[in-house]
Regions:
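N-terminal amphipathic alpha-helix/helix-capping segment at the start of soluble metabolic enzymes
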Residues: 2-41, 135
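Structural preference for beta-strand elements that scaffold enzyme active sites
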Residues: 21-23, 36-40, 67-69, 89-95, ...
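Glycine-rich, proline-tolerant flexible connector loops at the mouths of alpha/beta enzymes
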Residues: 42-50, 61-88, 115-123, 185-194
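Alpha-helix-loop-beta-strand connector modules within alpha/beta enzyme cores
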Residues: 74-96, 129-141, 201-212
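Hydrophobic or amphipathic alpha-helical targeting/insertion segments
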Residues: 101-142
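Catalytic alpha/beta core domains of metabolic enzymes, predominantly
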Residues: 146, 154-284
Length: 284
């Protein structure tokens, strides 16, 4: 499947081109290909707090969240995941920070996928060790590039966090994965700047057909954070770019899930759960 291919989506009488991507699965949820665009969020509890985390996950699922991400930054978090995953109503992804061994521990705990930041785990042997284990378990990995934590070498090469630097970071990580025969990949190239984020995703969509996870980093609290995140995510979705989305708000994660679901419904990309209430200012 060549990058840049599109399929047609009939949305409320309009024909919209959606970029065709490879399809992968996170647990029982398909991402990419012709699968519906999914909503993700992230828990704010300590992952070691099993009951508190599960309570939040159930609330997220009720709000329309399809996939949830939990931090795995210490042994206690990995132990918590081992109890959370079998009781979660939706697939669980482990968010890995700086220690590749935490990724291996999360895999052992039974998570449905991983998120790795190339700017935080940079040694090729560590990256390949995680990819090899994920390959053997059939688990997908998101390459989570962030403009604020790029590899210093790329930052110096491009004179800053440019779209080109972010795309190259993703491509470098993907090359390490391919060296060990791992291809269950999705990618994000997030930034707190909407124009930077949008351009990075556009450039990435031109060079790969892996599923893309959309988001604006540190969008902030509502309402400004909602506006900022929507500006970036909706722009790309209307261009046919994006297979899964997350609002990153300084707020209860349930608000993230609701916002993501409502955006997809507003764009005609997911079926509405609720009736639209339309207020006409000129009506009596």
């Amino acid at each position: 499947m060549a990058s840049g291919s599109v399929c047609r989506m009939d949305v409320a009488g309009w024909s919209t081109a959606r970029r065709v991507t490879k399809q992968i699965s996170v647990g029982n949820v398909a991402i990419g290909g012709s699968a519906p665009i999914t909503v993700q969020s992230m828990t704010t509890t300590k992952t070691a707090d099993v009951e508190g985390t599960l309570q939040q996950i159930y609330a997220l699922a009720a709000a329309g969240c399809d996939i949830v991400r939990c931090t795995c930054n210490e042994a206690e978090a990995a132990e918590g995941l081992a109890q959370i995953v079998p009781r979660s109503p939706i697939p669980v992804i482990a968010d890995i920070h700086h220690q590749y061994k935490m990724a291996l521990a999360a895999i052992e705990a039974g998570v449905h996928g991983l998120r790795l930041n190339p700017g935080n785990i940079r040694r090729p042997e560590h990256i390949k060790a995680v990819a090899t284990e994920a390959r053997d378990r059939g688990l997908p990995i998101r390459i989570g590039v962030n403009a604020g934590s790029l590899d210093p070498a790329l930052y110096d090469k491009y004179g800053g966090a440019t779209p080109e630097a972010m795309v190259e970071s993703a491509q470098q990580e993907m090359a390490y994965f391919h060296e060990v025969g791992f291809d269950l990949i999705k990618i994000s190239v997030k930034a707190s700047s909407v124009p930077l984020m949008v351009e990075a995703y556009r450039q990435l969509a031109d060079v790969t057909d892996v599923p893309l996870h959309l988001g604006v980093t540190e969008a902030g609290p509502p309402p400004a954070g909602l506006v900022k995140a929507t500006a970036g995510i909706a722009t790309l979705l209307l261009e046919g770019i994006g297979d899964t989305i997350r609002y990153s708000l300084t707020a209860d994660p349930v608000e993230e899930a609701r916002a993501g679901r409502q955006l997809l419904e507003a764009l005609g990309l997911r079926e509405r759960k609720n009736v639209d209430l339309i207020a006409c200012p000129s009506c009596g």
